[in-house]
From Swiss-Prot:
Gene: trmB
Natural source organism: Mycobacterium leprae (strain TN)
Catalytic residues of the enzyme: 136
NCBIfam families for the chain: tRNA (guanosine(46)-N7)-methyltransferase TrmB
EC annotation from Swiss-Prot or TrEMBL: 2.1.1.33
PROSITE patterns attached to this UniProt entry: SAM_MT_TRMB (PS51625)
Chain sites annotated for binding S-adenosyl-L-methionine: 61, 86, 113, 136
InterPro entries on file: SAM-dependent_MTases_sf (IPR029063), tRNA_(Gua-N-7)_MeTrfase_Trmb (IPR003358), tRNA_methyltr_TrmB_bact (IPR055361)
Protein name: tRNA (guanine-N(7)-)-methyltransferase
Catalytic activity from the UniProt record: guanosine(46) in tRNA + S-adenosyl-L-methionine = N(7)-methylguanosine(46) in tRNA + S-adenosyl-L-homocysteine
Length: 230
């Protein structure tokens, strides 16, 4: 049976930027951000070495939100380059201001749909890690097809990972956690990682405001990690 990538749909959110955010965006975005909102299949693959100005391990974070985890994990591993993808401009602006404040040099950003980025901008076997933290669970059954992590998406991610590369996910939605586990374990190129598995990147992440709120509501966070087979 053919695998199909999920239908792309996003919830509406306020996206107005503050005056300070607009100023920072105008000054820094041309240097460390690109827009993939206007999607075209003829887009060129990213040259990450040219974009970052060095050749090193690269991690892609899907749906970075306001960038709390992105910033902390990039600061923890300054020798690893991070590409943060987010469809909401306001979240990227918040991250951009934090990058400017803390003078972090190993983060780049893409404004657009992560599925498009993975399909057309990221080359096969080019990433050391893909992070998907708290993707929208789309809890209604009729909306499950919109969930980002589907068998076809996991297959695409596995193709973009280098051998030994890492898929790191987290969710506070129990049904989605079961689905993610099933899809990840069902991907032939991936094997489940545990505390004894040697990984090329850190999987230590900060607790975000969203996660704290979820825990206070009694939700259990499930963290799932896979390593691409050599």
């Amino acid at each position: 049976m053919a695998r199909h990538l999920p239908a792309t749909a996003f919830r509406k959110r306020r996206s107005a930027l503050s005056h300070a955010q607009r100023q920072t965006w105008e000054r820094l975005w041309p240097e460390i951000g690109i827009s993939a909102v206007s999607q075209t299949r003829s887009a060129e693959r990213l040259d990450t070495g040219a974009w970052f100005g060095r050749s090193t391990l690269v991690v892609l974070e899907v749906g970075c939100g306001s960038g709390t985890a992105t910033l902390a994990m990039a600061q923890h591993e300054p020798d690893i380059d991070v590409i943060a993808v987010e469809v909401y401009r306001r979240g990227l602006a918040q991250l951009l201001c934090a990058i400017d404040r803390d003078q972090v040099h190993n983060i780049r950003m893409i404004h657009g749909n992560a599925l498009y980025v993975l399909q057309y901008l990221i080359a096969p076997r080019s990433l050391t890690g893909v992070r998907v933290f708290f993707p929208d669970p789309w809890p209604k059954v009729r909306h499950h097809k919109r969930r980002f992590l589907q068998p076809a998406t996991v297959e695409l991610i596995a193709d973009r990972l280098l051998p030994g590369g890492v898929l790191h996910t987290a969710t506070d939605h129990p049904d989605y956690a079961k689905q993610i586990a099933k899809f990840g374990d069902g991907e032939p190129l991936l094997s489940r990682a545990d505390g004894r598995t040697q990984l090329p990147i850190s999987t230590v992440r900060p607790t975000t405001k969203y996660e704290t709120k979820a825990q206070h509501a009694g939700n259990v966070v499930t963290e799932l990690i896979w390593k691409k087979r050599s």
